[in-house]
């Protein structure tokens, strides 16, 4: 179950914060939308509506969740850059995944993710090293998160859900 739920392992912030690591993460955020498109472009509606694990979200819900989550992330970055350690607003991710738009075609979210990531990457590439020390406070987790750590966490998040989809495709021999 753990390998199905966390195919790339749990997230943990890096100890040694480097410019090179940050640049690699930003490059990954730039590439992720194309990877989601490539891995889902041949899936049927029945395949998109298959949960990646028992009790887990469907591929369709995962795609819409990434759109929702990364929109929130982008706004959290902007808040942290313009306010002093803002308290961000958590949201009910599981509840969002059950709303009617999570059953919509993924063709609504894939271009959105692509556009959002282009804006996000533009923001990230324009930030200074000092900007990445800005932070926000997550009240549900009771943690202050630097934008450096948040960048790594959202790269993990992107790769985590991409792995849910690619592992499901492999297990079911859909390719």
Swiss-Prot record:
Its main location: cytoplasm. It holds the Pfam family DinB_2. It is found in: Cytoplasm. Signal peptide: none annotated. Its EC number is 3.-.-.-. It is an enzyme of class 3 (hydrolase). SUPFAM superfamilies: DinB/YfiT-like putative metalloenzymes. Zn(2+) binds at residues 65, 157, 161. Its cofactor is Zn(2+). Keywords: Cytoplasm, Hydrolase, Metal-binding, Zinc. The keyword Zinc applies. GO terms for cellular component: cytoplasm. One of its GO terms (molecular function) is zinc ion binding. Belongs to the metal hydrolase YfiT family. Possible metal-dependent hydrolase. Homodimer. This is Putative metal-dependent hydrolase BPUM_0784. It comes from Bacillus pumilus (strain SAFR-032). The lineage of its organism: Bacteria, Bacillati, Bacillota, Bacilli, Bacillales.
């Amino acid at each position: 179950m753990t390998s199905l739920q966390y195919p790339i392992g749990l997230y943990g912030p890096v100890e040694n914060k480097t410019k090179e690591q940050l640049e690699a993460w930003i490059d990954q955020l730039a590439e992720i939308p194309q990877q989601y498109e490539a891995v889902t472009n041949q899936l049927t509606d029945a395949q998109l509506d298959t949960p990646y694990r028992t009790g887990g979200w469907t591929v369709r819900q995962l795609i819409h969740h990434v759109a929702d989550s990364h929109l929130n992330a982008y706004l959290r970055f902007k808040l942290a850059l313009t306010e002093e350690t803002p308290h961000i607003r958590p949201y009910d991710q599981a509840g969002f995944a059950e709303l009617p738009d999570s059953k919509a075609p993924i063709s609504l979210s894939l271009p959105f993710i692509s556009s959002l990531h282009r804006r996000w990457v533009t923001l990230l590439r324009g930030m200074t090293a000092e900007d990445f020390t800005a932070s926000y406070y997550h009240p549900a987790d009771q943690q202050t998160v630097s934008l450096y750590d948040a960048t790594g966490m959202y790269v993990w998040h992107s790769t985590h859900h991409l792995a849910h989809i690619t592992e499901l495709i492999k297990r079911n021999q859909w390719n």
